[in-house]
A protein has these predicted regions:
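Basic amphipathic alpha-helical segments that dock to polyanions
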Residues: 18-25
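A short, conserved structural fragment
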Residues: 25-31
Length: 180
């Protein structure tokens, strides 16, 4: 289990007892403000605790959905446009307008670590929106993987989501030409 400092205060009762638990190796300080009863904690678990409202997106979401075997160097996290800058070398922050942030948001689970991630349907829209920014080979790999699972996806949900984004006609046209 992973805790913030405030959660440790609730659990142990005082800063003194937290320090005592640390000294007795009942609790480990993972990084500033993050503690765990286990010595080894995944980066994903740390980031979901530190940034609970952030949503895995882009390269990270493509990887966790099994659409690419390229392990991202950074964790791509979507936050509301009005959010403050997240200062963390492990992440790439993607600002998303408030009216679009929750579209396709779902909960994922990786080895008991729960996290927010965009659905495969939402990520297909993101792939089509940002195809000119992504490396061509990477884009093609993910697109081909989408073609293989297209019958598992909810097409009406994709169309509904796409209509809420700017340049929705371009997204829908690319969906029809390149995926369906």
């Amino acid at each position: 289990m992973i805790y913030t400092y405030d959660e440790c205060l609730d659990k142990y009762g005082s800063d003194y007892l937290i320090k005592k638990a640390l000294k007795e190796n009942k609790l480990y300080k993972i990084e500033k403000g993050i503690y765990s009863e286990n010595k080894n904690v995944s980066v994903l678990e740390i980031l979901t605790k530190r940034y609970p409202k952030a949503i895995l997106t882009m390269n990270t979401a493509f990887y966790y959905h099994g659409l690419t075997d390229v392990i991202p160097e950074l964790y791509y996290l979507a936050t509301v446009s009005s959010s403050k800058k997240l200062v963390d070398k492990r992440i790439k922050q993607i600002y998303v307008p408030e009216d679009l942030i929750d579209i396709g948001k779902e909960e994922g689970n990786n080895n008991g670590v729960k996290y927010n991630i965009y659905s495969k349907e939402r990520m297909l829209i993101e792939l089509l929106r940002f195809k000119n920014i992504l490396p061509y080979d990477y884009y093609k790999e993910i697109l081909n993987n989408y073609r293989e699972i297209i019958y598992e996806l909810n097409i009406s949900k994709i169309e509904k989501y796409a209509k809420q984004f700017p340049k929705s006609k371009m997204i829908l046209e690319a969906l029809r030409k390149e995926v369906l």
